[in-house]
Structures are given as C-alpha cells and as structure tokens.
C-alpha cells in the first residue's frame, strides 16, 4: 500500500506480512511488525501515530517512533487496501466485507459500522479513500453510488447514482466541494455542504472507460486526476474546465501528489515515477 512519512520515519505495509518503519534519511530499518497476512493497506499518520489495515482482519494504530502497537481492532471481516481517514476523534476506513468502519482513534473502539446497497463484498466501499467535511463522510463504491454519511452516527445523509461514479472521491481545499470520476470520460463535482446531492458541475475529460481507484486531488484551485491508461489531467476546481492533459505510457497512474498547481509527483504501475511540470501560459507540460 501507499506509504506515509512523518518526523523522519517512513511507514508502509508489505505483501511479506510485515509493517515497516524506516529512517527517511538513510532507509535504515527502525522497527518491523509481523502480521498474519499480507499488508496491502495504505498508511495515514497523525500526531505520531500510523493507522493501517491488513489482510489479517485487523486494523492497527502504531507509534511511529517506537514501533509499538498502541491498539488493534480485530472486528474486520475482509481485507483492507484503502488509505484511512482521520476525522475529528475518528479513524474511518472501508474493507472488502461490505462495511465502512469508524473507530475511536485513541482507543480503537468501534463507534459505528456502515453498509448500504447490494449484498456481497464486491460492492464494498473498500478501494476509495474516504474524505470528510462539515460533519459528513463521503465515499464512492462499486455500485456506482456517491454517498454522504453522518460522521457522528454513521447514518446515510444522502446517496445518489445520478452520475455513475466509482470508487474515487476527493475534497476541495475549502472543504465545500467533492469530486469523483465517472466510469466514462467525465469528472463530477458535488456540494459538500448540503444535506442532499447537489451537483455543481460535470466535465467531459475524454478519458474513455475508467475504473482506476486513483483519487482526484485539489491543489491551488486545480483538480488533479489520473486514469488506468496513463493519462493525467488538470481541471478548474470551480468550473470543471479542462486545463491540461498529459499521457505517460499506458499503465495505471496512482493518486497524484500535487506540490503546487504547476507541479505534481506521479507513479505508474508500469514502473514510471516522475515530476510533471505544467506551464499554464504556454499550455506545455513535461
């Protein structure tokens, strides 16, 4: 899964059934935690604590300095691949068992568990990286639904299949809008402030059939996105206007890491890793 770094410590899970903490400066091993199955989940670090889920039906909070497991929740029924969300006093994540979980971030105690829609683990909100704002958690699932959930109670606030989105969601920097890719050509934007599904814009990017769980990310008024076929793109966050498109090979591009509206880091399953630089005046990118 996607690693995270804080206080000169890099934390990541591995298919060899371990969770590692490395010195970010020299790569030296600081600690290692053995689990009972491959660890495919991404990592989120807050206040010196790393949150990560595994395939052994456990979700762990780990002190990144010592490698000590602060708490472990063993109520997960499927494996975890998502990047956990830390919001207020909660840590929130989905698993391939139909459920979205909300745990107390300090104790690991289950606060609520959400599931709605068709039965079966293949419809789980497990690949999406949840986001939250204004007391609501937002997810998109394989049932092609975009959902807002009350962060306090775990009850559904609204749920819509209008735009046929799938497994991607991103939050605007001002926390007033959410973004999601549809399964064909387009990115949509909805309000994050309303108690009903209010679409703000839809943009035809022209990427074709799409199902890659790479999240849209806003930086300095630009929504950065990527696809399963090597395409990266930037949209105006307020209007959806396509600002630029850039292709790197034909493999899946992971969730982009924008450093500014002019620069973003990317990795691809084909092995590519790089820095994309965008000049908005000349519309050139390299």
What are these regions (language model features)?
Residues 17, 57, 98, 144, ...:
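Repetitive beta-architecture junctions, highlighting loop-to-beta-strand starts
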Residues 1-7, 15-16, 28-46, 55, ...:
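Extracytoplasmic beta-rich repeat domains
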Residues 48, 63, 94, 104, ...:
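Polar/charged low-complexity regions in secreted precursors and cytosolic/nuclear IDRs
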Residues 13, 53, 94, 140, ...:
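Residue-level marker for isolated small/hydroxyl-bearing positions within beta-strands
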Residues 10, 50, 91, 137, ...:
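Hydrophobic beta-strand positions that form the internal "hydrophobic ladder"
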Residues 20, 60, 101, 147, ...:
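WD40 beta-propeller blade core
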Residues 221, 228-229, 235-238, 247-249, ...:
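Short, loop-centered acidic/histidine patches that primarily coordinate divalent metals
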Residues 23-26, 63-67, 104-108, 150-153, ...:
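Short loop/turn segments that connect beta-strands within beta-propeller blades
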């Amino acid at each position: 899964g996607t690693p995270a770094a804080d206080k000169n410590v890099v934390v990541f899970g591995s298919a060899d059934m371990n969770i590692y903490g490395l010195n970010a400066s020299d790569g030296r091993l600081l600690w290692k935690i053995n689990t009972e199955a491959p660890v495919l989940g991404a990592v989120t670090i807050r206040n010196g604590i790393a949150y990560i889920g595994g395939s052994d039906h456990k979700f762990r909070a780990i002190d990144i300095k010592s490698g000590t497991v602060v708490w472990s929740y063993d109520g997960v029924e499927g494996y975890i691949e998502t990047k956990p969300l830390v919001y207020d006093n909660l840590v929130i994540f989905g698993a391939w068992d139909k459920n979205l979980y909300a745990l107390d971030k300090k104790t690991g105690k289950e606060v609520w568990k959400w599931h709605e829609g068709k039965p079966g683990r293949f419809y789980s909100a497990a690949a999406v990286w949840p986001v939250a704002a204004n007391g609501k958690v937002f997810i998109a699932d394989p049932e092609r639904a975009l959902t807002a959930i009350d962060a306090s109670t775990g009850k559904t606030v609204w749920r819509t299949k209008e735009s046929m989105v799938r497994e991607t969601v991103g939050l605007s920097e001002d926390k007033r809008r959410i973004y999601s890719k549809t399964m064909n050509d387009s990115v949509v934007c909805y309000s994050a402030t309303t108690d009903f599904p209010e679409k703000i814009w839809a943009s035809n990017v022209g990427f074709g059939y799409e199902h890659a769980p790479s999240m849209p990310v806003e930086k300095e008024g630009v929504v950065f996105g990527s696809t399963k076929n090597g395409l990266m793109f930037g949209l105006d966050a307020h209007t959806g206007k396509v600002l630029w498109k850039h292709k790197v090979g034909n493999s899946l591009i992971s969730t982009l890491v924008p450093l500014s509206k002019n620069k973003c880091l990317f990795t691809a399953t084909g092995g590519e890793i790089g820095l994309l630089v965008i000049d908005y005046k000349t519309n050139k990118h390299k």
